[in-house]
């Protein structure tokens, strides 16, 4: 219609009026001759127009009101049937209509006039034009007028003139459109005024047409009649129709339905028409198409089937398309039928053209995803409904399959290769001969599909996403067109692609909307789809969303099987890269969509299809599960056994780009990869890269495929897990074309990017990826068992890559990731292990390097999580794994050492996880790490970790693979202890804080903390741990380690022990030191005595260390000494401890055990330790000499070879001396107060130990077994030297019993012989009067005792006799050396010979006891001189015992081993008697000395008249000196005994007298021995005896008659004996004649003569009253006998005789008679 603005403007109105007038004038001119009425009417009209123009303000309205009159002239003109006039009139009428100045009445008149012209066949085109203008410019034509106008157009359509027909057809279409447009306009006009009825949704009863508004009614009537006409029924409204075609009717119906769907949807009347008229009509008209089967025999059916008619069928399909598209919601049931029909039309038995238009129709549906969604909701989701959507998709699939199964009749359908006839490859064939280039037939010239010999080209039919049909648009065709080869397949292919694209876009859009509505934020990244967890789509709380989800799922479930079947077939058949790309993209899209919706089975099915496409033909059959339906229940295997090597026929046209080995346990040849395989692989990579978040469990499928492809292509892992092309020699049968070679880096890059993109996956998806890789790796591991073939490392490499890019959330995947890699590290295949370790250590290092939020230093849990796998590697026995682990630790220390913090325990645990079976190199590497820790990182680690450092250092000490490391580790322990010392305050503070925290936590949990050395303070526990570890090393099997550890332990305790709390010392003593002593003692006593030949290599072992026993002895010595030193230096700390007494006892027990050891070294050292704890060796005080603390210097371990594992750390420099640190940090040691340590119980315990040691060690052996152990002299010396100091502490309570015990030990000690081996070093030469150290010690011990007794209380002095007894025993050794049990000892003189035979068997040599005995004698004499008057000495008959003791050497005299002995004995006797005799005389009445006198007499007798002979070489001077000694004895008798004869027992005096008589002459015996003669030659002695005798007889006043009698008898006997000797000599001389008498006889007579001379002299000197007269008579009676001797021939006798006779001159003057008388009487 014309615009109002253009027709109502003044200019337009003016122009209209002018034109009207002009038209009327022209009409008047034309008709003035032939048609006067018309002329008049025209002129009348001119006037009318003028009047209207002149009078009316609104010209157009006025014209319209008078239009019937205005138009009348023109109508009349048309009635003339004159062409020119008619044309003029029609033009004028059109002008009026265009200005909308025609009223309804006028319009009716015009239509009637037009009808007449039509019936007359005039101006047909003008008529059509006029009708069109009339209906389009205004809405005044209704009802019958409108009907008549439309019929007029229809009638003109069926003329014989094509132009008219076509113009009429176009006019009809336009008119029909105008009618409906009017209705739409009418609805728009009234929509606000009147509420519209609700759109119809189902069957409703027909409402009365009268309810419709005018335009609506016209439209209704028109549409109804169109249906009638198409159905070949009479119209109701279009009265006058004479002819109609169905094709045209269907076109009109389609245009109305397509252009005005809202009319039918908003008006029930129209909806009713659709349901009741249109749908049945369509179904009815479809009937021929449904029933017809191409190629079926007509005779087989009862009635001939009508052949489908292309124009109608095609138009019906168009109508159906519109119905489905526009009115699906109204016609649910009907559409179900239509859709089912569409599907049927695809059947193979339908004509090609029908299938083509059907597939085009379906294509139109496929580009409408919302429509498809509706189908799914309305049909597929209803319980008992046809699954329409599924059927459509399946039908497309079947259709495509059928095209390959039934070759089309076109010339291009000839097959290029018979099925199965392509070249196949066998395992033995040369892979290069199977055609590495494209096939040579025409099949590759055009894009096409080829399957089993059927070749179908791909045609370009429409642009993506549109359904531009070809045959549905052929409205002008009457005959069925020829469908070109490939057209239907190409459309069907596009149907599939558009279907996938459409539903994917729609569902993803709805998902996105659902997310937005549910406020779910999806994290997006470039080139990645939003990663949504399928389980979260959409939020299930919203029922609407639930509904949406169920629709999406149903759509997928309905279509995926058909889609997959079709796409898989097409993928297999495709020879075109673009087509393949589209197919793969569709499959990928579907897989992604299924993944988003959590539909596992379809997702896996599509992925499987892509995977199959990626792998060589038939390879996939064993790798992937071919059953799509059951795919979700299957596990995907990568094993690939039984791979079929036959190339299928469908791939003969494919370009082979690579030939390689399959990944299988037993490869049976080679497999080929085509360009399509590589293309599929890329799609697979793309899928995983972009849609990894939705893969879930199908990751395994994807990765398994990629692994096989990577293997076939020869890609190998490199650093970081990226895959790089392997070396050319990797596989002898791997052949790669140039094309694929250039692709490999790209594929490798995409692979890496794929795993890099895992950082954008959500957590669940990431877990799926990790699980899949782990599963894949497990299978690769299984394949590698018992197989030397290179394993597949794909999974391990990609686990590494995945881990590295997901460090920001490493926690969620760490455990499964590292857990699996640890399993890999345990695999027997070295290459597999190597990569497992590489991956694991790289991840750990990367994890520690990564900047986590919060930082690792603040996230202890994460740090421990990262380090834990490193620790778990320690459990793996493989050498290479441990090496890798330790390399990793070293790198961690170097890069992260300062920030490890809470991770230290784990790292240290790894370093310390050493085992002896690991070999030297591993231990060296681990030790290198430890050295670095100790030198560089002690200050940075938490103090709580220091204990672990100690444990680890200790474990290196204990390992037995590398001695130098053990020794160096002990040095490290010293450095560690020094560090503890330097930073003691800091460490203690940190440990205490930690302890408080632990105690608090334990209290909250209600548990008790259980820690070693509890309840010592934490810092002390640290020290105790260090000590305990050193203690363990002290009992190592290697001597060097034991020695170094022992030195370090005691140095550490000595240097740093002051830091310990007082109470902790209890633990040190009991848990460390005593425990160590126990272990050392046990090991020492059970050590092997076998000789060790050498120390390995060229090292010679000293004989003192050539058995394990001797080596352990050294350890025992060191340990005991160390403990004793601690007891000594720290006693002020130890003594206040609760159990010090018990500890003291234990220590003494250890000392005793050691002292009684069979090892001289140990036993001697034990005594030194004993001395130390008794403080015989006084300890150096700290406050006196701070620089020289005992044991402060750190021991330097002895290195047998170089230690190459020195860490790259800095040495720990100690800037200050330990003494300074001690004074700075610790309280100075207090001097030990006497009262502190004077605890008698301790000292008595020591005494008891000493006694037990002494008793056991000096006990003589029972048998003379060669193996008898004899204690050494140094040992015994040390033992005895202990006593004096010990005695100082026990002297107050030292009893007689104790003294006797002591005596036994002293006696035993000096009785012990020495080995001939040792004698040259201990024995003095026989001539030297030197005491051994032992003998000196023994005498010193006794000296100490006697001095204490001397100054001690009275009750102590009873011990004197015991001391004398002891000394007496020692004195006796001079003559009778002690026997040590039954042991045979050699005399010292014989031992000299053995000193030369160095290697002769050891013999036992008795010591030279003479000096010792003599010294003892001197001591005894000295002591007696001091103590002679003591009551105990008197009471216990000490003097008698002394004399008895002296009697032995005196009686032996010349027979004594040493001449000095008897001489000393004599002098000692003289000294003793000079003191003792006065005491004896004092106590003579008490009888206490009664037994002493006979002993003394015997002693004198034995000495003065010894039976021993002097040696032959005795000189005269010596003899005279000896005689002088005898004289001294006699003088003692004359001075000390005889003067006091009245106080002395008479028996004793008698014996003395007899002895003196015997001494004066010796001529009583009848035979003279040499000895007697010698004695007799002691003239001076005889003289003294005689003089003494005489003095004794006459000098003293006779106090008793008995005494005088004894004197007289003595003289009488003397004279009688002289008389007898003289007589016998005279007689013998006479008988001898001239022969001289024996010398002894001559000597005897000379002696007698001298005695007579002496007697007379003595008698002269004696007071006369003392001489009995009888004596004088006897003297004088000798004279005659003397005279008789004058005849003797011996001059010597003559001389003596002369001397004897001379004194008789005094008898020549007789005395007074009275006196003589008296004398005779």
UniProtKB/Swiss-Prot annotation:
Keywords annotated in UniProt: Protein transport, Transport
Comp. bias regions, Basic and acidic residues: 516-526
Domain of life from the UniProt record: Eukaryota
UniProt cross-references to InterPro entries, sorted A to Z: ARM-type_fold (IPR016024), DCB_dom (IPR032629), Mon2/Sec7/BIG1-like_HDS (IPR015403), Mon2/Sec7/BIG1-like_HUS (IPR032691), Mon2_C (IPR032817)
Transmembrane portions of the chain: none
Biological process terms in GO annotation: protein transport
Ranges for region Disordered: 414-439, 516-539
Family per similarity comment: Belongs to the MON2 family.
Function: May be required for traffic between late Golgi and early endosomes.
Name by which UniProt lists this protein: Protein MON2 homolog
């Amino acid at each position: 219609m014309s615009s109002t603005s253009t027709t109502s403007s003044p200019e337009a109105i003016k122009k209209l009026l002018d034109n009207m007038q002009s038209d009327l004038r022209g009409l008047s001119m034309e008709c003035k001759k032939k048609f006067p009425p018309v002329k008049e009417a025209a002129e009348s009209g001119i006037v009318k127009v003028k009047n209207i123009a002149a009078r009316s303000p609104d010209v157009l309205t006025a014209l319209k009101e008078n239009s019937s009159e205005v138009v009348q002239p023109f109508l009349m003109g048309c009635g003339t049937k004159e062409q020119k006039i008619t044309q003029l009139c029609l033009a004028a009428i059109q002008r009026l209509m265009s200005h909308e100045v025609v009223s309804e009445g006028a319009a009716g008149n015009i239509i009637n006039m037009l009808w007449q012209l039509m019936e007359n066949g005039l101006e047909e085109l003008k008529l059509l034009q006029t009708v069109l203008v009339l209906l389009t410019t205004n809405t005044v034509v209704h009802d019958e007028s409108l009907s008549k106008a439309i019929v007029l157009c229809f009638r003109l359509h069926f003329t014989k003139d094509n132009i008219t027909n076509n113009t009429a057809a176009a006019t009809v279409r336009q008119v029909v459109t105008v009618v409906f447009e009017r209705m739409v306009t009418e609805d728009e006009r009234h929509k606000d005024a009147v509420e519209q009825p609700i759109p119809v949704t189902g069957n409703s009863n027909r409402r009365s047409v009268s309810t419709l508004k005018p335009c609506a009614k016209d439209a209704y009537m028109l549409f109804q009649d169109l249906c009638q006409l198409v159905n070949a029924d009479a119209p109701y409204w279009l009265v006058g129709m004479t002819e109609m075609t169905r094709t045209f009717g269907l076109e009109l119906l389609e245009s109305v339905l397509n252009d005005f769907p809202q009319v039918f949807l908003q008006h029930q009347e129209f909806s009713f028409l659709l349901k009741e008229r249109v749908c049945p009509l369509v179904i009815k008209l479809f009937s021929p198409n449904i029933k017809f089967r191409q190629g079926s025999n007509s005779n087989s059916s009862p009635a001939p089937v009508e052949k489908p008619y292309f124009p109608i069928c095609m138009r019906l399909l168009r109508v159906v398309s519109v119905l489905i598209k526009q009115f699906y919601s109204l016609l649910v049931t009907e559409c179900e039928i239509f859709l089912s029909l569409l599907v049927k039309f695809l059947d193979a038995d339908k004509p090609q053209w029908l299938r083509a238009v059907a597939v085009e129709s379906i294509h139109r549906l496929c580009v409408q995803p919302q429509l498809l969604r509706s189908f799914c909701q309305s049909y597929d989701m209803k319980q008992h409904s046809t699954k329409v959507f599924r059927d459509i998709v399946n039908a497309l699939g079947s259709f495509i399959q059928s095209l390959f199964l039934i070759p089309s009749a076109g010339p291009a359908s000839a097959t290029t290769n018979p099925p199965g006839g392509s070249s196949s490859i066998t395992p033995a064939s040369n892979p290069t001969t199977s055609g590495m280039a494209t096939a040579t037939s025409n099949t590759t010239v055009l894009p096409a599909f080829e399957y089993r010999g059927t070749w179908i080209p791909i045609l370009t039919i429409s642009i993506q996403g549109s359904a531009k049909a070809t045959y549905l648009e052929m409205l002008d065709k009457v005959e069925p067109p020829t469908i070109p080869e490939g057209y239907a397949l190409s459309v069907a292919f596009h149907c599939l692609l558009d279907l996938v694209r459409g539903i994917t876009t729609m569902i993803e859009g709805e998902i996105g909307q659902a997310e937005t509505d549910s406020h779910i934020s999806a994290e997006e990244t470039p080139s990645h789809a939003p990663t949504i967890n399928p389980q979260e789509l959409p939020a299930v709380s919203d029922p609407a969303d639930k509904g949406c989800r169920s629709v999406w799922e149903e759509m997928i479930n309905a279509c995926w099987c058909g889609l997959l079947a079709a796409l898989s077939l097409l993928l297999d058949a495709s020879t075109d890269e673009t087509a393949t790309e589209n197919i793969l993209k569709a499959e990928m899209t579907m897989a992604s969509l299924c993944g988003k919706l959590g539909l596992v089975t379809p997702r896996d099915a599509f992925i499987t299809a892509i995977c199959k496409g990626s792998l060589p033909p038939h390879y996939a059959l064993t790798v992937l599960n071919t059953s799509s339906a059951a795919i979700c229940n299957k596990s995907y295997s990568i094993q690939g056994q039984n791979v079929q090597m036959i190339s299928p026929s469908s791939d003969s046209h494919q370009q082979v780009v690579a030939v390689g080995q399959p990944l299988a346990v037993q490869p049976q040849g080679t497999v080929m990869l085509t360009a399509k395989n590589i293309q599929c692989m890329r799609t697979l990579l793309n899928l995983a890269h972009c849609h990894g978040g939705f893969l879930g469990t199908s990751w395994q499928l994807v990765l398994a495929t990629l692994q096989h492809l990577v293997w076939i292509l020869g890609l190998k892992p490199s650093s970081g897990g990226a895959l790089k092309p392997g070396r050319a020699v990797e596989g002898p049968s791997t052949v790669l074309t140039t094309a694929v070679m250039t692709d490999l880096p790209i594929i490798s890059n995409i692979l890496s990017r794929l795993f890099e993109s895992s950082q954008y996956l959500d957590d669940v998806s990431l877990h799926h990826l990790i699980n899949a890789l782990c599963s894949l790796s497990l299978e690769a591991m299984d394949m590698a068992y018992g197989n030397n073939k290179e394993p597949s490392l794909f999974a391990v490499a990609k686990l590494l890559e995945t881990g590295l890019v997901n460090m920001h959330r490493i926690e969620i995947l760490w455990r499964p990731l590292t857990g699996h890699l640890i399993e890999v590290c345990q695999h027997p295949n070295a290459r597999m292990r190597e990569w497992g370790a590489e991956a694991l250590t790289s991840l750990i290092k990367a994890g520690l390097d990564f900047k986590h939020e919060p930082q690792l230093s603040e996230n202890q849990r994460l740090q421990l999580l990262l380090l834990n796998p490193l620790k778990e590697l320690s459990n793996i026995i493989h050498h290479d794994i441990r090496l890798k682990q330790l390399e990793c630790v070293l790198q961690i220390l170097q890069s992260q050492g300062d920030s490890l913090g809470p991770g230290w325990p784990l790292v240290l645990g790894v370093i310390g996880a050493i085992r002896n079976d690991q070999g030297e190199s591993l231990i060296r590497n681990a030790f290198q790490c430890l050295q670095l820790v100790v030198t560089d990182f002690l200050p940075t680690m938490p103090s709580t970790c220091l204990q672990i450092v100690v444990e680890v250092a200790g474990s290196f000490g204990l390992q037995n693979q590398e001695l130098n490391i053990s020794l160096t580790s002990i040095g490290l322990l010293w450095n560690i202890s020094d560090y503890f010392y330097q930073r003691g305050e800091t460490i203690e503070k940190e440990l205490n804080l930690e302890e408080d925290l632990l105690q608090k936590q334990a209290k909250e949990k209600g548990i008790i903390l259980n820690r070693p050395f509890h309840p010592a303070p934490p810092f002390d526990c640290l020290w105790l741990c260090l000590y305990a570890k050193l203690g363990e090393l002290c009992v190592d099997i290697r001597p060097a380690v034991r020695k170094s550890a022992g030195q370090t332990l005691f140095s550490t305790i000595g240097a740093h022990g002051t830091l310990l709390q007082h109470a902790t010392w209890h633990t040190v003593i009991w848990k460390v030191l005593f425990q160590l002593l126990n272990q050392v003692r046990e090991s020492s006593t059970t050590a092997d005595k076998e000789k060790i030949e050498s120390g390995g290599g060229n090292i010679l072992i000293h004989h003192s260390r050539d058995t394990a026993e001797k080596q352990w002895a050294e350890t025992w010595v060191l340990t005991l000494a160390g403990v004793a030193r601690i007891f000594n230096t720290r006693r002020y700390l130890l003594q206040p401890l609760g159990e010090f007494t018990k500890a003291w006892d234990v220590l003494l027990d250890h000392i005793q055990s050691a002292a009684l050891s069979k090892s001289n070294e140990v036993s001697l050292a034990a005594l030194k330790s004993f001395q130390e704890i008794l403080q015989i060796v006084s300890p150096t005080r700290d406050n006196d000499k701070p620089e020289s603390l005992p044991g402060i210097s750190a021991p330097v371990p002895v290195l047998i070879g170089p230690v190459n594992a020195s860490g790259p750390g800095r040495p720990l420099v100690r800037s200050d001396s330990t003494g300074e640190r001690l004074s700075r940090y610790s309280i100075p040691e207090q001097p030990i107060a006497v009262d502190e340590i004077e605890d008698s119980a301790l000292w008595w315990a020591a005494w008891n130990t000493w006694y037990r040691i002494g008793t056991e060690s000096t006990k003589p052996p029972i048998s003379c077994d060669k193996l008898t152990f004899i204690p050494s002299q140094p040992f015994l010396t040390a033992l005895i030297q202990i006593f004096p100091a010990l005695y100082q502490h026990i002297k107050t309570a030292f009893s007689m019993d104790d003294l006797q015990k002591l005596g036994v030990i002293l006696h035993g000690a000096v009785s012990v012989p020495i080995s001939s081996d040792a004698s040259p070093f201990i024995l003095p030469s026989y001539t030297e009067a030197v005491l051994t150290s032992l003998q000196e010690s023994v005498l010193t011990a006794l000296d100490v005792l006697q001095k204490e007794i001397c100054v001690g209380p009275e009750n102590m002095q009873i011990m004197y006799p015991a001391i004398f007894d002891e000394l007496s025993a020692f004195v006796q050794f001079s003559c009778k050396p002690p026997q040590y049990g039954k042991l045979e000892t050699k005399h010292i003189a014989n031992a000299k010979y053995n000193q030369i035979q160095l290697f002769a068997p050891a013999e036992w040599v008795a010591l030279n006891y003479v000096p010792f005995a003599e010294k003892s004698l001197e001591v005894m004499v000295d002591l007696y001189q001091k103590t002679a008057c003591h009551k105990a000495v008197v009471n216990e008959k000490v003097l008698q015992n002394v004399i008895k003791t002296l009697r032995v050497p005196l009686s032996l005299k010349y027979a004594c081993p040493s001449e000095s002995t008897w001489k000393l004995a004599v002098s000692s006797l003289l000294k003793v008697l000079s003191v003792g005799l006065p005491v004896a005389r004092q106590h003579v009445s008490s009888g206490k000395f009664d037994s002493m006198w006979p002993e003394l007499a015997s002693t004198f007798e034995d000495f003065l008249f010894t039976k021993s002979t002097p040696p032959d070489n005795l000189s005269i001077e010596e003899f005279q000196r000896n005689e002088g000694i005898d004289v001294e004895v006699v003088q003692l008798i004359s001075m000390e005994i005889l003067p006091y004869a009245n106080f002395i027992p008479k028996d004793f005096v008698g014996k003395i007298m007899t002895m003196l008589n015997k001494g004066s002459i010796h001529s009583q015996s009848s035979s003279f021995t040499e000895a007697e003669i010698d004695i007799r030659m002691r003239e001076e002695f005889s003289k003294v005896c005689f003089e003494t005798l005489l003095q004794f007889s006459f000098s003293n006043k006779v106090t008793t008659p008995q005494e005088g009698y004894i004197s007289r008898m003595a003289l009488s006997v003397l004279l009688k004996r002289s008389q007898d000797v003289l007589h016998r000599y005279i007689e013998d001389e006479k008988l001898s004649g001239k022969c001289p008498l024996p010398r002894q006889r001559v000597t005897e007579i000379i002696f007698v003569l001298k005695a007579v001379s002496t007697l007379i002299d003595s008698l002269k000197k004696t007071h006369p009253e003392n001489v009995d007269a009888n004596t004088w008579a006897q003297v004088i009676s000798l004279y005659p006998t003397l005279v008789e001797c004058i005849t003797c021939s011996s001059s010597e006798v003559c001389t003596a005789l002369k001397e004897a006779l001379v004194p008789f001159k005094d008898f020549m003057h007789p005395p007074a008679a009275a006196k003589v008388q008296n004398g005779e009487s």
